[in-house]
Amino acid sequence: PQKKAVVVYDTMWKSTETMANAIAEGISSTGVKVKPIHIRSSHRSDIMTDVLDAAAVVVGSPTLNNQMFPTVADVLVYMKGLKPVNKIGGAFGSYGWSGESVKQVAAELAAMKFSMIEPGPRLQYVPDGDGLAACIEYGRKIGEAVNAD
């Protein structure tokens, strides 16, 4: 894998997208190339090409009906079938009520033997200044892990 990271996410009301961009900013601040990928704006095969080429894969999902977002689940199932190796992983997301998605995404990545950087940011409603600062810091940790690898 190259010294680059992908931040793969979907969003309902832009909160998870805002988090994704802040995490990407944190990763970029460490000198690691980063590509944010909005799932519904990209073809699955193109997403996987980037995933397989990256050292770190950070996945973001809003919580919908106590679950990760369906499009995120789809990407994770497809990713699992490709058996990616030697990946640093991260999970993050936003929620309104319960917020299970982050733990669910993290569990899926851990099951694929990703070296997880935890805990990932889990923010309720619209990210505020503190929440965005936590996302930038999380991205920095991901970038540092890529540089140390």
Report residues per predicted region:
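Glycine-rich phosphate/diphosphate-binding loop of Rossmann-like nucleotide-binding domains
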Residues: Y9, K14-A20
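FMN-binding flavodoxin-like domain, especially the glycine-rich phosphate-binding loop
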Residues: K4, T18-I39, I47-D149
